[in-house]
Amino acid sequence: MAEEKETKKKRRNRRDEILQSLAQMLESSDGSQRITTAKLAATVGVSEAALYRHFPSKTKMFDSLIEFIEDSLVSRINLILKDEKETIARIRLILILILGFAEKNPGLSRILTGHALMFEQDRLQGRINQLYERIEVQLRQVIKERKIREGSAFLHDEALLASQLLAFCEGMLARFVRTEFRYHPTQEFEARWPLIQAQLQ
């Protein structure tokens, strides 16, 4: 029993090591090209066969990274909605969360922008699209609830405002990737925030 637990632990550690290596490769210059299993195996220091003992395909590796992104963002958005009741503060915190997560995880930002998925299965891009749609729905709900919570609605349609807020985040992430991570998504956020807030009328 103890041996079985130890084997599972080692297997989990190796899986994590493979995923961390893939994320690091996405952050490096390799991330702008197609990452092959041969390159990944060399980075991890194992054979390609060893990779496939932990993941049946490279697609499954990307699936695991996307799952981490989903869990990280969605769980933290839920915490924001639980702890913060004021609408504008909620929106601000959600934007900072998305931008900050990408900034702390440059390799994963290539997945969020779709750049790392250009050479992979379309299904993976579909998962990212669904994540953005889910976040947009949450933003729309936050905006819609303002009338109930605070007694006054926004002048503009909640769907329009939610898509505008998400488009801002996507644009900052795209800039981050395009500049090879030189311009951080949270850079000058405090200066930009009044411009964003001016749209929330």
Swiss-Prot record:
Q: Does the keyword Cytoplasm apply?
A: yes
Named from the GO MF annotations, one term is: sequence-specific DNA binding
Which subcellular locations apply to this protein?
Cytoplasm, Nucleoid
Q: Which keywords does this Swiss-Prot/TrEMBL entry list?
A: Cell cycle, Cell division, Coiled coil, Cytoplasm, DNA-binding
Give the matching InterPro entries. DNA-bd_HTH_TetR-type_CS, Homeodomain-like_sf, HTH-type_Tx_Regulator, HTH_TetR, NO_SlmA, SlmA-like_C, Tet_transcr_reg_TetR-rel_C_sf
Top-rank taxon = Bacteria
Subcellular location, principal? cytoplasm
Which GO biological-process labels does this protein carry? Answer: cell division; negative regulation of division septum assembly
Where's the HTH tetR-type domain?
12-73
* Coiled-coil segments: 122-147
Keyword Cell cycle found: yes
Cited PROSITE patterns: HTH_TETR_1, HTH_TETR_2
- Quote the cellular component terms of the Gene Ontology held in the record: bacterial nucleoid; cytoplasm
Q: Which Pfam families match?
A: SlmA-like_C, TetR_N
| UniProt DNA-binding residue ranges | 36-55
Q: Hey, which family's this protein in?
A: Belongs to the nucleoid occlusion factor SlmA family.
Biological role: Required for nucleoid occlusion (NO) phenomenon, which prevents Z-ring formation and cell division over the nucleoid. Acts as a DNA-associated cell division inhibitor that binds simultaneously chromosomal DNA and FtsZ, and disrupts the assembly of FtsZ polymers. SlmA-DNA-binding sequences (SBS) are dispersed on non-Ter regions of the chromosome, preventing FtsZ polymerization at these regions.
Enumerate the PANTHER family for this protein: ACREF/ENVCD OPERON REPRESSOR-RELATED, ACREF_ENVCD OPERON REPRESSOR-RELATED
**Subunit structure and binding partners:** Homodimer. Interacts with FtsZ.
Q: What name does UniProt use for this protein?
A: Nucleoid occlusion factor SlmA
Q: Which organism is it from?
A: Proteus mirabilis (strain HI4320)
Q: What is the lineage of its organism?
A: Bacteria, Pseudomonadati, Pseudomonadota, Gammaproteobacteria, Enterobacterales
